[in-house]
Amino acid sequence: MNHSTGNCSSKENFSADTTADLKVEEVPEAVINTLSPRREHFTRSCSGGGPRCNRESLPGMVTQRSCVYGGARVVLMPITDAAHLVHGPVGCAACTWDIRGSRSSKSELYRMGFSTGLEEKDVVFGGEDKLLECILEINEIHSPSAIFVYSTCVSGVIGDDIAAVCRTAENKTGKWVIQVQSEGFRSFNKSLGHQLACDVILRHIIGRGDAEVRENSVNLVGEFNVAGDLWEIKGLLEKMGIHVVSSITGDSTVAEISEAHTAQLNIVQCSKSSGYIAEEMKRKYGIPYINVNFFGIKETMDSLLSISDFFDLNAEERISSMAEKTHEMIRGYRRALEGKKVAIYVGGNKAWSLIRAFRDLGMEVIMSGTQNGLPEDYLKIMEKSGRELILFDDANPVELSELLRKYRPDLVVSGAKEKYLSYKLGIPFCEFNHDRIKPFSGFGGFLNFAEEVKRTLESPIWTLASKKRLSGPGGMSGEA
């Protein structure tokens, strides 16, 4: 019996010309080998779009993200003369103590950690009495200008009426006692915590002072004085005759922020954490704002020129002279760093500003990722890069180690959580987030950054410890 059909009964039906026209598209190589639900979080910029982002982390993935409470804490904590009381288990306060790395020229109270230390019995019987007792004790011992009370997951779940306790405490102490409704479970993205903290500043602090309006006055919004960055920026502004009313929130006091509504301009350094404040102050007080970036020579120069244009200061020649002098000073660093490859894993705003900075040093960014990036962040990264690079979102330690092992950058730029992973792989690491000890903002700060990168890459340790590669999650073996 013949089972063949008329359509495909024999090879003779396929001509040589037909087979020559058959084309099979090449399957693109995966960026790294990871779980299938995570593959879209890793991409190449040449594919035309960024990675999948702004999504809940995959359960069990050991994400390196922070929570809503952590997002609120990093915005408010740099207010130097306030007490920051965490209404939750002691671990919540411990994990975020000094998390910002902010420096102060005023009070050091903000660096003290306060927690109600909720335990099992408080979950059963409630923690309101404990909270009130803690607030009264803090006020008696430290007499802060204000007390911020942070909600956490536990206090949110058990339903403590923190707002009522804060009102009672205000009546008893005469101080501002302000609830920050920052339960960690409210969102997968800490950016909600940023907005909640901004709401607290807008509703409870800004507008309560009564200072006179001064000429050429600004607020520095979204500047947290990490390692003294604020002081570098203020120095540049003062040379131009600019008066800084307040910094929101680095090296600030409650009184200074209460007078922020008297400024003539808001200059926004980190739009993701504090752009919301600038928008609301424009709506409520009519204060215009401009976005600035004081990391890198070109970015610092452009930011100062924008401020100069707003106030009609005619400072172009002075600003250009400072920028040119800085270019002259980094030439030696550029010769030493030319052609080195860099991997970046930082916040969205930092990621794209670093690309231009490394270009000034003759270095090439080959991969860039963020923990809480938005689509527009990745688009800006691609725009600033102008070349193909690996993009990734919310990478866990195993994924990050695979990226570094596969693409072998000469330098990793990230934060404390990634430092020791990089060291274990034998790759030089530069701290850019909150644990660094030198300012990187402004012209002087960029020289510090160039020196830090050069010193890191030229450390003798890398001649003694050859680069390794991970053999798996549990160990390390083999040469790169």
Swiss-Prot record:
Its pathway, per UniProt, is: Cofactor biosynthesis; Fe-Mo cofactor biosynthesis
Extract the coiled-coil ranges from the record.
Answer: none
One GO-annotated biological process of the protein: protein-containing complex assembly
User: From the Swiss-Prot or TrEMBL record, what is one GO molecular function term?
Assistant: nitrogenase activity
**Which InterPro entries does the protein's record reference?**
Nase/OxRdtase_comp1 (IPR000510), Nase_comp1_CS (IPR000318), NifE (IPR005973), NifE-like (IPR049939)
Q: What does the UniProt keyword field contain? A: Nitrogen fixation
Family indicated by similarity: Belongs to the NifD/NifK/NifE/NifN family.
State what this protein does.
This protein may play a role in the biosynthesis of the prosthetic group of nitrogenase (FeMo cofactor).
In Swiss-Prot or TrEMBL terms, this protein is called Nitrogenase iron-molybdenum cofactor biosynthesis protein NifE
- Provide the species name: Methanothermobacter marburgensis (strain ATCC BAA-927 / DSM 2133 / JCM 14651 / NBRC 100331 / OCM 82 / Marburg)
Q: Which gene encodes it?
A: nifE
